[in-house]
Structure formats: C-alpha cells, structure tokens
Regions:
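Active-site cofactor/cluster-binding pocket
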Residues: 49-85, 91-227
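Iron-sulfur cluster-binding cysteine motifs and their immediate structural context
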Residues: 2-28, 33-58
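Short conserved micro-motifs on helix faces and helix-strand junctions that flank
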Residues: 2, 86-87
Length: 227
C-alpha cells in the first residue's frame, strides 16, 4: 500500500480505513464492516491480491481477565429514566435499544423506544430514545427532550459528541459511556487525507459531562473477545 487511497475512491466504501504508520498513512479493510462487493479492488493498486479457493482464517480471541463485578446500584425512578443510545447504522444500535426495552418489560416495568435513524442506512448516524418507568402509564412521550437524558450509551464518538446529542444531556444528571475508537465517516471516501478530530470530540464530551463520562475503545475490546 502506497497510501494513495484509490481503493476508497473507487469503492466509496467506509470499510476501507486509514492506518497511520511511520511510513505515512496506509489503508486496511475493516472486516466487520466489509460488505464483500470487492469494488475496492478496482483501485489502481498492486497491493490487492485475489486468492481463489482460499478460506478465511478466523482471528484468535482472548478471554478478558475481569475482576468480580459487584451488582450495580440501580437508581430510583421518579417518573421516567431516559436513555439515549447513539452510534452508526449497521452496528447494533437499534438492537441495544430493543434489548433494554424488552428487559424492562420482562422485569415488570414500563418501556418505550423510538428509532431516530432518518435516512441512515449502513454507516449513518443513529439515535435511539428509550424511556424506562416503574409503570407503563408513567410514560407519556418517548422522545427524550433537551437536557433530560439520564444515561448516554455512545457507540460512536462522532455521533455522541455532536450538538444534537449533547443538547439532550445535562451537567450533573447525565452519565455516559462512549466508544472512543476512530470510526471513519463517509467524508474519508471523498477526502483521502481526512482525519477525525478525536481529541476535540473527546474534550467536547468531557467539557459537557465533566467526570460523568467514561471513554474507552470498545471496538478493540469487541475485536479481542469476539474476533
């Protein structure tokens, strides 16, 4: 790879990701995002090699040595407990919201969820609003209003630090856990030297939520444990 980016230009695919090396920016294929249309091989590049009849070797996984985790202290729900889940289409954001709502119903509580995906298909911004309550009748409107988010689960740093998301949060009320992994946006398919301003996005979250935000590379954790 010479870092020209023609594979991304030809394929218009966000599975072509940047890799920063001591020899400059190179390219790699994010296997979890690849849709296998192989249009990236149309790029004028000798580093793509096609193997006929080869089988994909699954990467080795590791077992995380986690300490014994205590049971969480559940908050007292006065009215509703409002959860916002953000991320990129195609990565399970809607599934997380559905699991939360279903778990609440199984536990005898009320739950309501809406998907705010708009035109987002694979790779687009997705917002899930989920309200939990002791009784279903305690939930009037499902959409979380400005400053009413109690918990933010961020699957993507860009979406989580956007003004639309931060407007739902409130200092002293909202707690957040956000994936700090660099997930490339569609801009990278058009601008080969585009870089996500990770530091600025992280600072925006920390300035808003102060010590109530936790940033971690959950994408790398998933790769290590799931392959």
């Amino acid at each position: 790879c010479e870092g020209c980016g023609d594979c991304g230009v030809q394929s218009n695919c966000v599975a072509v990701t940047p890799v920063e090396t001591e020899l400059g920016r190179k390219r790699a294929i994010d296997q979890s995002a690849c849709n296998k249309d192989f249009s990236c091989v149309k790029g004028f590049c000798p580093s793509f090699v096609t193997l006929q009849g080869a089988q994909i070797r699954k990467s080795q996984t590791a077992q995380l040595d986690l300490p014994q985790m205590p049971e969480p202290v559940l908050p007292n729900i006065d009215g509703t407990f409002n959860v916002v889940v953000t991320g990129v289409g195609g990565t399970g954001v809607v599934t997380i919201g559905a699991v939360l709502a279903q778990a609440a119903q199984i536990d005898g509580k009320g739950a309501g969820m809406i998907e705010m995906a708009g035109l987002a298909q694979k790779g687009g911004a997705v917002h899930i609003h989920c309200r939990l309550a002791n009784r279903p009748e305690d939930i009037n409107a499902i959409r979380v209003a400005t400053g009413e988010c109690d918990a933010l689960i961020g699957g993507d740093l860009v979406v989580s630090a956007a003004a639309k998301t931060l407007g739902l949060t409130k200092v002293g009320r909202t707690g957040a856990v956000v994936n700090a992994h660099d997930i490339v946006t569609g801009e990278f398919t058009r601008e080969t030297e585009f870089s996500i301003p990770t530091d600025r996005l992280s600072l925006a979250l920390q300035a808003r939520l102060q010590d109530r935000v936790q940033l971690l590379d959950s994408t790398e954790l998933a790769r290590i444990t799931m392959g």
